[in-house]
A protein has these predicted regions:
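Transmembrane catalytic cores of multi-pass membrane glycosyltransferases
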Residues: 5, 25-27, 98-99, 103, ...
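Extracytoplasmic catalytic/substrate-binding loops of multi-pass membrane glycan-assembly enzymes
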Residues: 1-12, 22-36, 331-339
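Membrane-interface helix-loop-helix junctions at transmembrane boundaries of multi-pass membrane enzymes
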Residues: 121, 161-171, 236-263, 268, ...
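Extracytoplasmic
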Residues: 13-17, 310-386, 435
């Protein structure tokens, strides 16, 4: 499993199958799907890998439904290729952001529902949209944010086109829906609720260390840098063409086109802080793909379609060139992972223990040692007083680090298992102050790793 967070899903599925609960508090829908596959196969790692391969490909179905509305023979195939071969899908989400990519087909499905909004009765369209949004709400927080942005701008365009009248009842329904989403996060995933309240109370944090600086100074993820350039240029180019041919769109089409373009442009803005940008910009290709399909289908001239086609081709070429970099590296090489597995067999931890390890290694540690874990990045601010013993996993070659950092950026996973309803938050004052002593008892020593007891 590539990336830093691949083993995270193994732990979650195992905990769900064995304990009927998650090891880390999280939105559960995708993990429930993985657990169902694991029960059928009796193989958790294979189940997670299968979900990582198959769930994103489900986007092909709603894309086909969107594109087949227009009499252009190859449009469905080109639209599907643009999405499934997008470098974000292939190289950024794989392994680390499985929940993101698994929820993306639902966003495409919602776009199709909005596109055909006026073709259905009120009961049918509200039921379909509500069910889809509910499924997204239980899949991934970032994808839910994308969905709410699309819906908000879609609603504004519909109001401007006088297709929706503002009524007290409608306003009440919107407010109630928002409160229900917030309540769901507070009850199901307290850590996500904490992040939401932190964002609301400190909205300026989203602009700290803007992405353009990362690109300018050369430390930006190549996939993300590519996403910024393509999404910003693509949004402007498609917006100009859409404005020129605006009279050819139906109300349903123009509502989806403008809302999708605005969201794609906002999410890929280089002024967003790099930590947020790694999560938000990666989703921008979804609304960009939807708007691109609709604008291409309605374009009036060969030159307009050529420009849109060129954008799609450049995206696919970027995908091909990035593939030469190889897959996202795993936390450990095969040989070092084999050594770590042998090392884990020699470890016998006492009850009520926790292992502190570098990001990525904490998930592999939990998987192989069957214990609670914490990331070393949050060690000093995590309250671990309830544990009888604390161990620190050290790599003999690089201290607490792993082989090679993932290109995915910072993790959005909870910092500590076992007490996942009380996640550590680096923006808050520490509840407990933990100090790593200069020397500890080396209780387990392997060829590559050492386990030190610090308390």
């Amino acid at each position: 499993m590539p990336g830093l967070d691949g083993a995270y899903y193994w732990i979650q599925v195992r905990s769900l199958l064995e304990n009927s609960s998650l090891a880390f508090s999280d939105l559960p829908l995708v993990i429930y799907v993985q657990a169902g596959i694991a029960r059928l196969l009796n193989d958790i790692p294979s189940a997670v890998r299968i979900s990582d391969a198959i769930l994103p490909a489900l986007s092909a179905f709603p894309i086909y439904l969107i594109a087949r509305r227009y009499p252009i023979r190859l449009l469905p195939a080109v639209g599907i290729a643009f999405v499934l071969l997008n470098p974000v899908q292939l190289f950024f989400f794989t392994g680390d952001f499985i929940k993101n990519e698994a929820a993306i087909p639902l966003v495409f499905l919602l776009s199709w529902i909005l596109l055909s909004w006026d073709e259905r009765g009120a009961r049918s369209r509200y039921a379909m949209a509500g069910t889809t949004i509910l499924a997204i709400s239980f899949s991934h927080f970032g994808t839910l944010l994308l969905t709410l942005m699309i819906l908000s701008f879609w609603l504004l365009v519909r109001i401007r086109q006088k297709q929706i009248k503002i009524r007290p009842l409608a306003i009440g329904i919107v407010i109630l829906s928002g409160l229900l989403v917030v309540l769901m996060l507070a009850l199901v995933v307290p850590s996500r609720f904490t992040r939401l309240t932190t964002f609301i109370s400190n909205p300026g944090d989203i602009f700290i260390l803007p992405a353009w600086r990362a690109i300018f100074y050369g430390y930006a993820n190549p996939v993300i840098a590519c996403t910024i350039i393509l999404c910003q240029i693509g949004s402007i180019l498609l917006g100009v063409i859409a404005w020129k041919i605006r009279s050819t769109f139906s109300i349903s089409e123009i509502s989806v086109v403008w809302s999708s373009l605005i969201v794609a442009f906002v999410l890929s803005s280089p002024i967003i802080g790099i930590d947020w940008f790694n999560r938000l910009a990666a989703l921008a290709f979804v609304p960009l793909a939807v708007s691109g399909i609709l604008i291409f289908a309605k374009s009036l001239t060969v030159s307009q379609r050529s420009l849109i086609g060129a954008l799609a081709v450049i995206t696919l070429l970027a995908s091909a060139s990035l593939s030469l970099r190889g897959p996202t590296p795993p936390v450990l090489s095969e040989s070092r992972y084999s050594d770590f597995k042998e090392f884990a067999k020699t470890v016998d931890l006492p009850e009520n223990s926790i292992v502190v390890a570098s990001h990525g290694m904490e998930f592999l540690s939990s998987w192989l040692l069957a214990t609670d874990v914490a990331s070393d990045a949050y060690y000093e601010t995590s309250c671990l007083s309830s544990y009888s013993a604390i161990f620190l996993l050290i790599d003999k070659h690089v201290g607490v680090a792993s082989d090679k950092p993932s290109s995915a950026g910072a993790s959005d996973k909870p910092a500590t298992s076992g007490e996942s309803d009380k996640p550590a938050d680096s923006n808050k004052k520490p509840v407990c102050k933990n100090q790593i002593p200069p020397e500890g008892a080396k209780v387990f020593v392997g060829n590559e790793f050492v386990l030190v007891q610090v308390r």
